[in-house]
Amino acid sequence: MAKLYYEKDCNLEVLKGKKVAIIGYGSQGHAHALNLKNSGVDVVVGLYEGSKSWERAEAEGLKVAVASDAAAEADVVVILVNDEKQVQVYEESIKPNLTAGKYLMFAHGFNIHYGQIVPSEDVNVFMVAPKGPGHTVRSQYQEGKGVPCLVSVYQDATGNTMDVALAYAAGIGGARAGVLKTTFKEETETDLFGEQAVLCGGVTELMKVGFEVLVEAGYEPESAYFECVHEMKLIIDMVVEGGLGNMRQSISDTAEYGDYSVGKRIITDETKKEMKKVLHEVQDGTFARNWILENKANRPAFTARRRMEQSHQVEVVGKELRDMMSWSKQSKK
């Protein structure tokens, strides 16, 4: 059973007297910086010259500096730019200023696990990975709650890296909900597999193909969208709230019977075999190599596929329906 830590296991005082540099001010960077600041931690945000986020961060009461300067003055350097941009930012702005005994933190293990970033052995390396988007990390903190986090130590040069990691997790509110001990390998491989086979790749194809089957059979696209896409959130919310059993208890008996009798016909043994292949490609680095090469080639296949998916009928119909819904209009205000 994996070890769980809560606020009682974390000492926020460990970060007092240390300066934390948050490199990047996107979804996670924004949340981490503000939560740490509100927790009494000395924070500086590191950005590139001319960043659109510079004024925003300053307006929210944060000190901002060029990334290299932020890394130079900090004891803990937190790299929260996108995975594909991390190597360049690390090499140009962080590595020259990462002296012995400093701490380097990641929120995802990709570049460490796949050897794209290799810190010196005299640097502490750890991960705190909130299991939720940045806006949720921030809103939950403001409500006195928190988003669960994963924590791992990759290098412990000074012998107290886990203490610093747990203090950081507490500082962003994660220890209120629970901090699960893991490894860089486990976090990276399970995260990538979950995204590809279930949460993103699996679910989007399931919704899209379900929509296509109904439309090709002559049903109205709007009805197909509601049944195969829109209602997904309603089902997932029930699962998140109380598990699969809670969802099945909440739906009709007819729906539950259909779940049991048809589910295995859709997700077959062949599907499971393919999912195992996907996992193997994550484990042996095939996916990572392909993604790294795609980025080095300026993303031709990725960009083409993104454009194609955006023009799919399910997206066109979905936008039209959302524009008609009062709750959707309200959420955009």
Curated annotation (Swiss-Prot):
Required cofactor names: Mg(2+)
Cofactor: how and how many bound: Binds 2 magnesium ions per subunit.
Pathway: Amino-acid biosynthesis; L-isoleucine biosynthesis; L-isoleucine from 2-oxobutanoate: step 2/4; Amino-acid biosynthesis; L-valine biosynthesis; L-valine from pyruvate: step 2/4
Keyword Membrane tagged: no
Pfam families assigned: KARI_C, KARI_N
Keyword line: Amino-acid biosynthesis, Branched-chain amino acid biosynthesis, Magnesium, Metal-binding, NADP, Oxidoreductase
Entries under PANTHER family matching the protein: KETOL-ACID REDUCTOISOMERASE, MITOCHONDRIAL (PTHR21371:SF1)
Species, as recorded: Alkaliphilus metalliredigens (strain QYMF)
Catalytic residues of the enzyme: H108
Binding positions for NADP(+) per the UniProt entry: Y25, G26, S27, Q28, S51, S53, D83, E84, K85, Q86, G134
Similarity remark: Belongs to the ketol-acid reductoisomerase family.
Cited function: Involved in the biosynthesis of branched-chain amino acids (BCAA). Catalyzes an alkyl-migration followed by a ketol-acid reduction of (S)-2-acetolactate (S2AL) to yield (R)-2,3-dihydroxy-isovalerate. In the isomerase reaction, S2AL is rearranged via a Mg-dependent methyl migration to produce 3-hydroxy-3-methyl-2-ketobutyrate (HMKB). In the reductase reaction, this 2-ketoacid undergoes a metal-dependent reduction by NADPH to yield (R)-2,3-dihydroxy-isovalerate.
Binding positions (substrate): S252
Gene Ontology terms for molecular function: ketol-acid reductoisomerase activity; magnesium ion binding; NADP binding
A GO-annotated cellular component: cytosol
Residues noted as binding Mg(2+) 2 in the record, renumbered to the chain: D191, E227, E231
Binding-site positions, Mg(2+) 1: D191, E195
Gene Ontology biological process terms from the UniProt entry: isoleucine biosynthetic process; L-valine biosynthetic process
PROSITE patterns to which the protein is assigned, alphabetical: KARI_C, KARI_N
Enzyme Commission number(s) of this protein: 1.1.1.86
InterPro entries attached to this UniProt entry: 6-PGluconate_DH-like_C_sf (IPR008927), KARI (IPR013023), KARI_C (IPR000506), KARI_N (IPR013116), KARI_prok (IPR014359), NAD(P)-bd_dom_sf (IPR036291)
Annotated protein name in UniProt: Ketol-acid reductoisomerase (NADP(+))
